[in-house]
Structure formats: C-alpha cells, structure tokens
C-alpha cells in the first residue's frame, strides 16, 4: 500500500507539472485517495487508478480530444513509472527520446541512398536526448528488418536494387530506451534509371489537431463540420458527428443523452490521421 501511495504521488506530480508547463499553469491538483478498489489492491504489484478528465466537463474535453495532449499525458504516465522504478532501485532515471523529425531521403554519389533526420529535444527532460539511432529498412511491402545502429543523424544505403521500393523508419535511443518510430519515407530506383528523371515527393502535411470548438452562448461542442481535427496515426474513439450543442439539454436516457450527444455512424470505423 505504501508503494501504491508513492507511485500515485509521483504519477500525479509528474502529470500536473508537465501539464502546467505545456498547457495551463493553473492546472488543478486534486486529492489522492487511498481506497479499497480491487483493481489496485488485489494485484501483488504497485498500481494506481488514474482519473484525469471528465467527459461531462467541456473544458476537459477540449484537451482530451487533442491528440497532442493525449500523447503528452501518456508520456507523463510512462515517466512517472520510470521515476518510481529508479527510486526503488537507486539509480538516476533516463527518459527515452522523443520521435525524430524531418526524415528525408536523397540520392547521392554513385546511386547511393542517404536517409537523414533531426533529433527532437524534450524541453521537460534534459536527459531525454538521443545518444544514437536505430534505422529500420524494409523492401517493397515486406516487414522491417532488424534495425541498424548509427551514431550520426544520417544513414547511407550502398546497395540499391532497381525496381525495389525501400522504406525507412528511424528511432532515437539512449540509456532510457528507444523512442517511438518516426513516420515512414520511401525511395526507389526504376529499371533503366539513367533515362528516368528523379522525382522528389514532399510530405508537407504534418498537422495533428483536435476538432474545431464551438462556443456561442449556451451552445458548446465540437464542430467537425468546420474542422474534423487530425488524429495522430489512427483514431478509434470518434463515433460520429455531435448533434446536441445545447449545454442546457438534460440527459433523459441512453437514447436521448442530452448535451454532447453524437451520432454513432462511425462506431466501427478506424480513422486515419
């Protein structure tokens, strides 16, 4: 129980400190409960039950529907577990790097393919910088081969086979582990390449966002007819367009849930960001 209390305190402190630094300096810190909830009491390992947002609180949901916020909270939860374990075993915690950015490929001398990228520093964690990188390479529609370790922020593929599309992902690594993978880039050389001009494809779309917010008098909600937002990767949570924007609309039953009610036309869909 004492370990649970320590883990809960570390987790709450980490989340609140990070959210105050990145989103709202007045983010409220609530009390920690010590209750006999079986999910946290019965397992013979430290555990906490985390309640961060309320779906009935419009201000909370403006954060909760933002994929950037969700990533940051998830990282805070991971960091708190790293802090807890480090304290238990008496070592200095090192936090895994953030995913790299600005991934690109280019042809260089003698038909070699160069992949380069930039590290992303974490302003909240001074020791989260990458010490090295793992480059993953796949051919055509095949799976990724085991990664190749490099110290610099570039990698050169020497042997290029004509007619094959090479796909790349990169992850940063340090003593704390491996970052989440980067986006994927690809390049290939068609047969008879000396007669074919080089074509460069630029991925100019890197936006992720919550849906548009509607606040006008007593009308509040998420106006996806103006901006649906963009998921980070894939989204399983979006079930359909909101149709009840009246904040005074009461809950009657599950078929008439009142303010915030939405259609369920997309319940089975996985949306790509």
Sequence positions of predicted segments:
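Active-site-proximal beta-strand/loop segments in catalytic clefts of secreted hydrolases
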Residues: 1, 10-15, 35, 51-58, ...
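Active-site-adjacent substrate-binding region
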Residues: 2-34
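Active-site-adjacent mobile loop/cap segments within catalytic or ligand-binding domains
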Residues: 24-91
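Pro/Thr/Ser/Gly-rich low-complexity, intrinsically disordered linker/stalk tracts
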Residues: 83-127, 162, 176-197
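Short beta-strand elements bearing conserved aromatic residues within extracellular beta-rich modules
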Residues: 131-135
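Short beta-strand segments within Ig-like beta-sandwich modules, predominantly Fibronectin type-III
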Residues: 145-152
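Beta-strand-rich modules
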Residues: 156-179
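Aromatic-Pro/Gly-enriched surface loop or interdomain linker
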Residues: 184-273
């Amino acid at each position: 129980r004492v370990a649970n209390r320590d883990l809960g305190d570390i987790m709450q402190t980490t989340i609140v400190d990070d959210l105050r630094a990145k989103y709202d300096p007045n983010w409220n810190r609530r009390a920690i409960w010590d209750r006999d909830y079986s999910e946290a009491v019965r397992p013979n390992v430290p555990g906490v039950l985390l309640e961060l947002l309320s779906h009935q609180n419009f201000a909370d949901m403006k954060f909760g529907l933002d994929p950037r916020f969700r990533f940051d909270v998830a990282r805070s939860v991971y960091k708190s577990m790293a802090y807890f374990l480090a304290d238990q075993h008496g070592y200095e915690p090192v936090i895994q790097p953030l995913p790299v950015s600005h991934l690109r490929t280019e042809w260089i001398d003698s038909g070699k393919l160069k992949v380069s990228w930039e590290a992303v520093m974490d302003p909240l964690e001074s020791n989260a910088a990458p010490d090295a990188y793992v480059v993953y390479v796949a051919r055509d529609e095949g799976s990724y081969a085991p990664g190749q370790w490099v110290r610099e922020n570039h990698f050169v593929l020497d042997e290029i086979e004509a007619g094959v599309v090479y796909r790349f992902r990169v992850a940063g690594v340090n003593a704390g582990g491996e970052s989440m993978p980067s986006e994927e880039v690809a390049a290939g050389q068609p047969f008879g390449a000396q007669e074919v001009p080089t074509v460069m494809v630029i991925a100019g779309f890197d936006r992720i966002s919550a849906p548009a917010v509607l606040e006008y008098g007593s009308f509040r909600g998420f106006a996806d007819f103006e901006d649906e937002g963009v998921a980070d990767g894939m989204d399983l949570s979006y079930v359909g367009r909101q149709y009840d924007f009246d904040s005074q609309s009461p809950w009657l039953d599950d078929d008439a849930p009142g303010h915030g009610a939405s259609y369920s036309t997309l319940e089975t869909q996985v949306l790509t960001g």
